[in-house]
Structure formats: structure tokens, C-alpha cells
Regions:
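Metallo-beta-lactamase
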Residues: 13, 18, 23-113
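C-terminal regulatory/interaction regions
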Residues: 117-119
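Conserved acidic catalytic loop of the alpha/beta-hydrolase fold
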Residues: 7-9
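Short acidic-hydrophobic, aromatic-tinged amphipathic segments that line or gate anion-handling sites
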Residues: 1-4
Length: 119
């Protein structure tokens, strides 16, 4: 869990991270200006963990790992979620910048992450 490997094919180089929580085999993929978050992170929050095979603690550890990874990616890159949900203002964005995700995503800024880090 929470291990990133580099995958290359032709001119495409991607980082693939095992990000369990929502599902045991969930992965996120980043490269070429995008972070494909799948069901780990949405534009404003994170994926569900009340499904068969979900693991809430693994999800929080995956979000913590993702946050550390996102802090080191270019801030203008796009975070693309696996699902689109309405925001409180009624918009339904397809993506957010990594900068905006780090500032406004509830899960990326949750006090739970501070507890996991031991702060």
C-alpha cells in the first residue's frame, strides 16, 4: 500500500500508486499534467469507505500519502476525480488544480491527517 512505481510505454511516463481504502486494489495515476485520483479523492472530498472491502484507516493513510505526493507535483496540474459531484455553489467541476485541491479539499485538510502524522 501507498507505494508508487514508475510505468513507461513509448513516450508516456506515469506514476502508479497503490491507494487502498475505497477498494483494496485501488490505484491513482499521475503524469503529463494530471493526477487521476479515481475514487480516492474527488474535487471537494474523498471516496466512500462503507462498501464491501472498504477500509477507512487504509483510506486515510492513502489520503495522507496522496497529500504528500500532491505537495511535490506542479500546482497547475489537474486533479481528475473518478466521479463528479455538485459543489455547494451548484457547479459540478470535472477537475480542480492541485493547488485548489490542496487548499479546499476537505479530506486533504482533515484533522485526521494530523493525527496520523502524530502532530
Amino acid at each position: 500500500p501507498n507505494t508508487t512505481i514508475q510505468w513507461s510505454c513509448g513516450g508516456i511516463d506515469l506514476g502508479v500508486t497503490h491507494s487502498p481504502g475505497h477498494a483494496p486494489g485501488h490505484v491513482t495515476i499521475h503524469g503529463h499534467g494530471v493526477y487521476h485520483a479515481g475514487d480516492l479523492l474527488f474535487t471537494a472530498h474523498s471516496g466512500r469507505v462503507d462498501l464491501p472491502g472498504s477500509d477507512p484507516l487504509a483510506q486515510w493513510n492513502s489520503i495522507l500519502y496522496a497529500r504528500k505526493l500532491l505537495l511535490n507535483l506542479p500546482k497547475e496540474w489537474r486533479l481528475i476525480p473518478g466521479h463528479r459531484y455538485d459543489w455547494i455553489d451548484g457547479t459540478t467541476p470535472d477537475w480542480v488544480s492541485i493547488e485548489d485541491a490542496l487548499k479546499h479539499n476537505f479530506s486533504l485538510n482533515s484533522p485526521v491527517l494530523q493525527q496520523l502524522e502524530g502532530n
